[in-house]
Curated annotation (Swiss-Prot):
Protein name (database record): MLO-like protein 1
Pfam families: Mlo
Extracellular compartment segments: 1-11, 83-160, 394-412
TM segment ranges: 12-32, 62-82, 161-181, 288-308, 309-329, 373-393, 413-433
Lineage start: Eukaryota, Viridiplantae, Streptophyta, Embryophyta, Tracheophyta
Domain notes: The C-terminus contains a calmodulin-binding domain, which binds calmodulin in a calcium-dependent fashion.
Region described as Disordered: 471-526
Gene: MLO1
Cytoplasmic side: 33-61, 182-287, 330-372, 434-526
Major place of residence: membrane
Organism field: Arabidopsis thaliana (Mouse-ear cress)
Function summary: May be involved in modulation of pathogen defense and leaf cell death. Activity seems to be regulated by Ca(2+)-dependent calmodulin binding and seems not to require heterotrimeric G proteins.
Family (UniProt): Belongs to the MLO family.
Membrane topology, record value: Multi-pass membrane protein
Length: 526
């Protein structure tokens, strides 16, 4: 039991060791599962359905990780016995062959961050020794054929850990972004409350009936008058700079809120726009928290391009940085376009300034593209940070994969900058500007009203299909009647949602692409 004791099989391992380790693993797993279940119960009690669905998305990601882990464990023996010629593995290496020889010569005397972590986590060192023993077996298997293993057990083990670190980092960064962003958005609640108070102020009501010059309005002064009035380039420059300071002002909030209400629910001027905006953001959050298939494709491409001398880690850090600046600039420019439309059409107005929301202000007339970009930005930034810490813990700070210090520091600075800017500027901007499209989202209704509307729409669709089928039948057959509850095709009473009677609907669109299934198209002709 001396030197080879660490390689003993389960047959010669004490039962108390097996039972103890099994107990710890099962206890930790059950604790995490119960904790997630508790969070789900709390969200249900508070009627936070979007956040509950986001939690379910996290559970799906954990299940996917478990399945990936199972596949790697089951097939690691088969993968390690897949042998190839040595010259096949001499191309597209993350580190040069000289670096590998230098690392092998100095491995026994260099103290790295990896060894520091192994001091506190002895199981890591034990795992590496066990992997070394298995690696010797697999190398012997392939050497008999004059070949080398395609992927060593140790490399497979490190890849296994990286996938877990990446997924956990992405979920963590998304949650932190939404928490910090929601904190910023909650500061706007005082503006919503002040608007509600002004409705009962006689002086405010009298002032709204006055005729005012458009260029004297604070919203127009901020977005139309100034350096961007007569130049497109200067206008975009102003939008670019504004995302770094006062990205959303009170005049922005008041004007955009009024434009939304007058366009989509004119009959309900008392709509709590702030509460609706928060519900819509929670709906969007469940789209962002997961790792979509196209993000996994990005991971594979990045792992493929991680070639020595290309400095892929350094250049890839600029992708989310550039995208984040572009998204923030575009969102600010949408607000500027709304101001330009009003200022160019009117000289003076009676009452409040009203803007006209439209999909035409967004890229390809699709506001949901912005959400996809934010999703990619958060994932790529999480990928960058996760990869850094994974390399640091696994191979050490001086690893050739880590790169030189002059490439490491800018990456970390950019990563922190992206996280802060996205949390406190871009996400709040998206929360309000995304409402400036041609459609409003189903979050405008309370949950019980949403269920009633969806049920009503399904019944209308079923009756329409039955009528279409009957009209295509024999001419002599009797036509299907409309039925007692389908006379006018009007929506049923929504009970607590009767306050939304001012919202006129022509149809409820439920598409399969992206987050458009959250949108309801209003009828502007009524």
């Amino acid at each position: 039991m001396g030197h080879g004791g660490e390689g003993m099989s389960l047959e010669f391992t004490p039962t108390w060791v097996v039972a103890g380790v099994c107990t710890v693993i099962v206890a930790i797993s059950l604790a995490v599962e119960r904790l997630l279940h508790y969070f789900g119960t709390v969200l249900k009690k508070k009627k936070q359905k979007p956040l509950y669905e986001a939690l379910q998305k996290v559970k799906e990601e954990l299940m996917l990780l478990g399945f990936i882990s199972l596949l790697l464990t089951v097939f690691q023996g088969l993968i390690s016995k897949f042998c190839v010629k040595e010259n096949v593995l001499m191309h597209m290496l993350p580190c040069s062959l000289d670096s590998r020889r230098e690392a092998g010569a100095s491995e026994h005397k260099n103290v790295t961050a990896k060894e520091h972590f192994q001091t506190f986590l002895p199981i890591v060192g034990t795992t590496r020794r066990l992997l070394a023993e298995h690696a010797a077996v697999q190398v012997g298997y392939c050497s008999e054929k004059g070949k080398v293993p395609l992927l060593s057990l140790e490399a497979l083990h490190h890849l296994h850990i990286f996938i877990f670190v990446l997924a956990i980092s992405h979920v963590t960064f998304c949650v932190l972004t939404v928490i910090f962003g929601s904190t910023r958005i909650h500061q706007w609640k005082k503006w919503e409350d002040s608007i509600a108070d002004e409705k009962f102020d006689p002086e405010t009501a009298l002032r709204k009936r006055r005729v005012t010059h458009v260029h004297n309005h604070a919203f127009i002064k901020e977005h139309f008058l100034g350096i961007g009035k007569d130049s497109v380039i200067l206008g975009w420059t102003q939008s670019f700079l504004k995302q770094f300071y006062d990205s959303v002002t009170k005049s922005d909030y008041v004007t955009l809120r009024l434009g939304f209400i007058m366009t989509h629910c004119k009959g309900n001027p008392k709509l709590n726009f702030h509460k609706y905006m928060m519900r819509a953001l929670e709906d969007d959050f469940k789209q962002v928290v997961g790792i979509s298939w196209y993000l996994w494709i990005f991971v594979v491409i990045f792992l493929l391009l991680n070639v020595n001398g290309w400095h892929t880690y350094f250049w890839i850090a600029f992708i989310p940085f550039a995208l984040l600046l572009a998204v923030g600039t575009k969102l600010e420019h949408v607000i500027a376009q709304l101001a330009h439309e009003v200022a160019e059409k009117h000289v003076a107005i009676e009452g409040d300034l009203v803007v006209k929301p439209s999909d035409e202000h967004f890229w390809f007339s699709k506001p949901q593209i912005v959400l996809y970009l934010i999703h990619f930005i958060l994932f790529q930034n999480a990928f960058e940070i996760a990869f850094f810490f994974w390399i640091w813990v696994t191979y050490g700070f001086d690893s050739c994969i880590m790169g030189q210090v002059r490439y490491i520091v800018p990456r970390l600075v950019i990563g922190v900058f992206i996280q802060v800017l996205c949390s406190y500027s871009t996400l709040p901007l998206y929360a309000i500007v995304s409402q400036m499209g041609s459609s409003f989202k189903k979050a405008i209704f309370e949950e019980n009203v949403q269920v009633g509307l969806v049920g009503w729409a399904q019944k209308v669709k079923q009756k329409r299909d039955l009528k279409a089928a009957a009209s295509n039948g024999d001419e002599g057959s009797s036509q299907a009647g409309p039925g007692p509850d389908s006379g006018s095709g009007s929506a049923p009473a929504a009970g607590p949602g009767a306050g939304f009677a001012g919202i006129q609907l022509s149809r409820v669109t439920r598409n399969n692409a992206g987050d458009t299934n959250n949108e309801i198209t209003p009828d502007h002709n009524n």
